[in-house]
Amino acid sequence: MSIIVNQIVLHQLVKTSQDENTVQLKTHLRDELLPITAETEQMMLQLHQEYQNKTKAYGVFQETSNFAQILNRTLENDIDFLAFSHQSAELLRQELGKYSFANDGTLILCQYNFLATDYLFIALLDSRYSMLVDENLEIKQTHYLDITQFDIACRINLTELHLDAKSTRYLTFIKGRVGRKIADFFMDFLGAEEGLNPQVQNQCLLQAVSDYCQQADLTKEQTQAVKKQVFDYCKGQINVGEEIVVTELSANIPTLNEQSFVDFAVSQNYGLEENIPPVRTALKSLTKFSGSGKGITLSFDAELLNSRIFWDEATDSLTITGLPPNLRDQLQRQTKE
């Protein structure tokens, strides 16, 4: 798959001092855009692919967003991309300096097209140090941009923003390992608030599937078969990096009580989006029971309940018949010691 880079620029944020709660940063700005070469396009393709695999949250611009105002001026050709990047770098410097985790970094801003969709990608990349051997077989230190490990990044779907300004999913940002501070920081920088919540959408989808089966008075086995079909479709979408399309999902499961799943979901007002970003951990509950606590972790296929695994609610206990061989072997070895 190819990527078309339209405009790209790099700037640097340099840490000059730090106290207990804040960091002083300065900007080192380019005075012209980067030339578009095979190297820049290859870098952006890799960044795009890495970003696709990150855990992301969704946001929308607030009416008072300074960043959105600058972006709109750029899209309307009131200012050029270089000026936009300079103003964005300054906004980023101001917001990032409020957090103790702030550090040096290379800021990349790129407007590109992938699969007929226009994007604006913004990321703060770290530099890494390594060693190289030159033509004289001498060992020297070098540093390079780390384009595989990054936590501070966002992407705006410019095509979706243009077609539907009320969309709740045109803006995404990484939910970084540093925790909530990363989300707060990017929300402040972008002047954004929470948009689509994939976890909530997945939970609503699961509830809709359960209710759909219940209203048709399906047996336990029939219900589990439908849930397995739902899970298989969703797993397939995850494997190819696509979202759950509710109409496609509906076509992959039986029509119950002469009503398709999509019609049922609409009539019952579950608030499902037409396309839902899949959350793997949430979808697992379609076919598995799992839980952990007090030193115990359990996970088993839902179809085993009341066949090999029995729950006694009164005594709050599970009875398991036919233990996994490796677990049985461990228990036998332990009791013989």
From Swiss-Prot:
Domain of life, source organism: Bacteria
Q: Which InterPro entries match?
A: Nucleoid_associated_NdpA
A cellular component term from Gene Ontology for this protein is: cytoplasm
According to the record, the signal peptide region is none
Query: Which key words tag this protein in UniProt?
Result: Cytoplasm
Quote the subcellular location field of this record.
Cytoplasm, Nucleoid
Mind telling me what this protein is named?
Answer: Nucleoid-associated protein HSM_0096
Q: Which Pfam families match?
A: NA37 (PF04245)
Species of the source: Histophilus somni (strain 2336) (Haemophilus somnus)
A molecular function (GO) term: single-stranded RNA binding
For this chain, the family text in UniProt reads:
Belongs to the YejK family.
